[in-house]
């Protein structure tokens, strides 16, 4: 490992310690699963009302909605998970190399997300039209599925914990078993060519999210004889986001999760439970709420989504292209940048000259456009934007600390040149 690489690894470790979870990891592991149940129960049985009561009997009634696992849900999920794993391993797609590991080696990854995504949609569509699968099954089985996937992830994380105990030198567990169970012990656990972290990060959770949305739309149609404009907006926006994700799938290889985070309960549960079951809250809510939107409202929400997308994708692609070719023209002029002592270039024009994370800003605009179609009858569809804002604020701080540790003076110079973190003139 070069001197530079060991400095980078030391910076990652330092930042991880500062922006890690402290002791809150235990609280998260205990509190988050009930929170997902809570939101689902509020949306499904209480018309989206946030239930708070001091009446113990009312709470007992509330929690009695937690659904036990069923063989039906377990069978569905097993078929789903194994089917997606088979696609990850065997579906056609280019093989690309991941980022350098701490020992200097690189892993191969099969980038077949878009094929798997479209193939899955075609198969599900075929099964539904032939009458072998009910279009509303994911809505009807949502409660049992939530329990099944929760149980699965807790067990799977146990498997991952033991898997990593004999891992590489840089993967040594901390010796605090519950913490290691939460954070994971292996960076890239693999069964044959199946990279479990990359697979769970994208496939069984993200494609499931889209299918759940479609199932919600089908249920709305079954119950009310219509699929409303707000439902079409939510399903359309989120489908577009997912297609875009799979088209640019390779970008996931440079994310913090793939580069630095071990694969334990946190990522596993986040990918398989949190993502599909909370990112569908808007569609879940709309199943029982068939309000319309004024035309100006629809235009404003679509405009917000498209503007957010243009910023989010524009900023990410601009950085990607610039890092490959610093002589590129950015917004009609030669790119301006700071050359760091480490040799990395920091773009200071285009989106990266307006704020240091315009890509987060664009992502937040998109997230808000997913919530607004639900109108203002319940706070639950807005849960996503609240959570996502907290997530990205935390990420920005962590990334800033990481870049400061890596680039020192050069980063301070960039911060001076581009003072806004995420939102120009505001934050
Ligand atoms: N939907 C979700 O759940 C979710 C969650 C998280 C993130 N995201 C999205 O994923 C996308 C990527 O996010 P990310 O967290 O990986 O952050 P990012 O902004 O894509 O990457 C930050 C890294 O880029 C480099 N960099 C920073 N400033 C630069 C500049 N001016 N010029 C060139 N390089 C610069 C630095 O790394 P090096 O110098 O070391 O290369 C820095 O660590 C974002 O659009 C974000 O909104 C989505």
Curated annotation (Swiss-Prot):
GO terms for molecular function: Delta14-sterol reductase activity; NADP binding. PROSITE patterns: STEROL_REDUCT_1, STEROL_REDUCT_2. It comes from the Bacteria. It is found in: Cell inner membrane. Residues 47-70, 132-141, 219-226, 284-291, 378 are periplasmic. One of its GO terms (cellular component) is plasma membrane. Keywords: Cell inner membrane, Cell membrane, Lipid biosynthesis, Lipid metabolism, Membrane, NADP, Nucleotide-binding, Oxidoreductase, Steroid biosynthesis, Steroid metabolism, Sterol biosynthesis, Sterol metabolism, Transmembrane, Transmembrane helix. Residues 1-25, 92-110, 163-197, 248-262, 313-356, 400-427 are cytoplasmic. Coiled coil: none annotated. GO terms for biological process: ergosterol biosynthetic process; sterol biosynthetic process. The chain crosses the membrane at residues 26-46, 71-91, 111-131, 142-162, 198-218, 227-247, 263-283, 292-312, 357-377, 379-399. NADP(+) binds at residues 319, 323, 347, 352, 359-360, 399, 403-407, 414. Pathway: Steroid biosynthesis; zymosterol biosynthesis; zymosterol from lanosterol. Changing residue 395 to A: Loss of catalytic activity. Belongs to the ERG4/ERG24 family. Reduces the C14=C15 double bond of 4,4-dimethyl-cholesta-8,14,24-trienol to produce 4,4-dimethyl-cholesta-8,24-dienol. Complements the deletion of the Delta(14)-sterol reductase gene ERG24 in yeast. This is Delta(14)-sterol reductase. It comes from Methylotuvimicrobium alcaliphilum (strain DSM 19304 / NCIMB 14124 / VKM B-2133 / 20Z). The lineage of its organism: Bacteria, Pseudomonadati, Pseudomonadota, Gammaproteobacteria, Methylococcales. The gene is erg.
